[in-house]
């Protein structure tokens, strides 16, 4: 049996329990409710985040194991309310959301939450389109198949973004042919 196969059946009873904290090198992963400020504080261990990038559920589009989301705005307000104390004053928040269609039209389900974010001092700094390039197969009820999602960008004040990360291999040949010669075009 190939351990990399995708047909592995998950256990009937989950191994991870709420409160489990996993230390993964410099990273930390906590099984908890993001609306719980104490859990968020435990995860960050005294640090404050520069960036929160998340992809929450899109409205009440799916039936999760919890039975769905009764109030999407309340869920989002709880999550971002708890996050406030965990973020630096110059933090950036990016939230990936997709379209939801009901009654044969797309729904601006995010409007109430976006206004709530503004009332909490978060500016609508940017609104981006994530081009996913590959169309998702399926019956789209006469609409073109979606190939994008939105990314909403909030902040309290402008901060020039650091768009680069130092590269360990800068200046080194990393793409060599089997014979050891360089693939770099010179």
Task: State the predicted function of each range.
Residues 1-186:
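Core catalytic lobe of class I
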């Amino acid at each position: 049996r190939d351990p990399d196969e995708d047909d592995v059946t998950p256990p009937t009873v989950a191994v991870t329990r709420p409160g489990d904290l996993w230390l993964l090198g410099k990273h930390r992963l906590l099984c908890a409710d993001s609306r719980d400020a104490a859990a968020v504080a435990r995860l960050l261990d005294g640090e404050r985040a520069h960036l929160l990038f998340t992809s929450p559920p899109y409205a009440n589009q799916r039936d999760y194991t919890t039975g769905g989301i009764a109030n999407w705005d309340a869920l989002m307000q709880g999550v971002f309310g708890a996050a406030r104390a965990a973020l630096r004053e110059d933090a950036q928040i990016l939230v990936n959301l997709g379209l939801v269609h009901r009654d044969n039209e797309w729904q601006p389900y995010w409007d109430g939450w976006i206004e709530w974010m503004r009332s909490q001092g978060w500016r609508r700094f940017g609104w981006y389109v994530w081009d996913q390039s590959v169309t998702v197969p399926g019956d789209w009820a006469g609409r073109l198949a979606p190939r994008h999602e939105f990314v909403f960008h909030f902040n309290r004040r402008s901060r020039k973004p650091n768009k680069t990360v130092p590269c360990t291999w800068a200046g080194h040949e990393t793409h060599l042919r089997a014979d050891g010669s360089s693939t770099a075009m010179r």
